[in-house]
Amino acid sequence: MEDDCDIIIIGAGIAGTACALRCARAGLSVLLLERAEIPGSKNLSGGRLYTHALAELLPQFHLTAPLERRITHESLSLLTPDGVTTFSSLQPGGESWSVLRARFDPWLVAEAEKEGVECIPGATVDALYEENGRVCGVICGDDILRARYVVLAEGANSVLAERHGLVTRPAGEAMALGIKEVLSLETSAIEERFHLENNEGAALLFSGRICDDLPGGAFLYTNQQTLSLGIVCPLSSLTQSRVPASELLTRFKAHPAVRPLIKNTESLEYGAHLVPEGGLHSMPVQYAGNGWLLVGDALRSCVNTGISVRGMDMALTGAQAAAQTLISACQHREPQNLFPLYHHNVERSLLWDVLQRYQHVPALLQRPGWYRTWPALMQDISRDLWDQGDKPVPPLRQLFWHHLRRHGLWHLAGDVIRSLRCL
């Protein structure tokens, strides 16, 4: 039987759509299947896009892309139950933007359609179609759609890939649950509250006592007329906790360092999303095969650097490697096992460099000291530095030495040594 197209891609998220666009640009016929009626309506991310990979895909993206604000203000806050120590910086030349996936994804799909991609929203893929051990299409209801190659870009919850035995379910330690809320706030209030002007944006990251005693982090990004607020906590830790995930977000919003930032806001959106932040060691051993390959969150290519989570830009970078693989494979008449070529292209990409660079960070972030001891230490030191009571402030070295010993010098030293080895 003849193929319906060269490439079928399951999932019109950032990775799937970018891969489709590149393949179509090279002259391949591409069918992009999306289960949502509107692309982006089922996609959730923190909301910060590093645009280097987008610029390679669409050099003139800034003319039409629905970007929110250019991130120029950065801060990292270490929270204790009732206090905070914050490190902040101003970077006017930053090349990252806040985005809302409900607006960004439809735009990216439209750009892909301009290159000839056929996108079918509201399409449910029930199974992969296989012949003689090779994936050569998909089954949608009573219909079989055939293609030379199939790309699985179905997200972190890779139901089809797991059902067909292409990958195994990831360990709980390798997955996190992100809970996000979009809050409405007038533009003038956002710019006044976060000290912004001229379409500037702020990225506020939080660590410490966010998810009670659980490891985790949180974020707040400014958009044009909304705030993106959320927490991220390891799935394995959540399953051991008796606190519902939604309650953790509620407690975070009530923290004295967060509450003033979100006052007089109204909730517009709320959702949860699995985040594959296990890094290099959580990637599937075999992420491509006879007629198929994985891309995006299905590839588990999200990278937690410790102070940021790089998801969307890594999805775009991985999509480039996937498209290169498919374009090369389609030049051969006989079907190809995609893994050798795909692995070669991934290893030559920025994605692989970043994955290797931060491969030990997930294990490092499991150490409880980062969430308990270090925030408390920084708060104690800063409090004593600013204390102007009736007693003279002790020498700085004496102050540091006192608090280091009180919080456990050797445990702190162990954290530092492991960090230096990892980073």
Swiss-Prot record:
Keywords: FAD, Flavoprotein, Oxidoreductase
Enzyme class: oxidoreductase
Binding site for FAD: 7-21
Organism domain of life: Bacteria
The enzyme's E.C. designation: 1.5.5.-
The protein's required cofactors: FAD
Entry GO CC: plasma membrane
Molecular-function GO term, any one: oxidoreductase activity
Protein role: Probably accepts electrons from YgcQ/YgcR and reduces a quinone.
Family stated for the protein in its record: Belongs to the ETF-QO/FixC family.
Protein name: Probable electron transfer flavoprotein-quinone oxidoreductase YgcN
Organism listed in the record: Escherichia coli (strain K12)
